[in-house]
């Protein structure tokens, strides 16, 4: 039982050392991630359309 208590005390200690982002930082990072995902979604969709068009042009 002492091992469990020691473990959870260690977890609590480490969680207190963790630096969490502010609301502004969290919002900024969320916008960056969502923007990047949308960019790559559009990029790969356009790439897929281009490859499909090229395939249809070459092979009918």
Curated annotation (Swiss-Prot):
Keyword tags: Cell membrane, Membrane, Protein transport, Translocation, Transmembrane, Transmembrane helix, Transport
Annotated GO CC locations: plasma membrane
UniProt record, GO biological process: intracellular protein transmembrane transport; protein secretion; protein targeting; protein transport by the Sec complex
PROSITE patterns: SECE_SEC61G (PS01067)
Sequence intervals crossing the membrane: 31-51
Molecular function terms, GO-annotated: protein transmembrane transporter activity
Primary location recorded for the protein, binned into one broad class: membrane
Protein topology in the membrane: Single-pass membrane protein
Compartments reported by the entry: Cell membrane
Keyword Hydrolase part of the UniProt annotation: no
Role description: Essential subunit of the Sec protein translocation channel SecYEG. Clamps together the 2 halves of SecY. May contact the channel plug during translocation.
Cited HAMAP family: SecE (MF_00422)
Family: Belongs to the SecE/SEC61-gamma family.
Cited PANTHER family: PROTEIN TRANSLOCASE SUBUNIT SECE (PTHR33910:SF1)
Quaternary structure (record): Component of the Sec protein translocase complex. Heterotrimer consisting of SecY, SecE and SecG subunits. The heterotrimers can form oligomers, although 1 heterotrimer is thought to be able to translocate proteins. Interacts with the ribosome. Interacts with SecDF, and other proteins may be involved. Interacts with SecA.
Name used for this protein in its record: Protein translocase subunit SecE
Organism, scientific name: Staphylococcus aureus (strain NCTC 8325 / PS 47)
Gene that encodes the chain: secE
């Amino acid at each position: 039982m002492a091992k469990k208590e020691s473990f959870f005390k260690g977890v609590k200690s480490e969680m207190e050392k963790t630096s969490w982002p502010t609301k502004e930082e969290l919002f900024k990072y969320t916008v960056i991630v969502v923007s990047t995902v949308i960019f790559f979604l559009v990029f790969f969709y356009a790439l897929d359309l281009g490859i499909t068009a090229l395939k249809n042009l070459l092979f009918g």
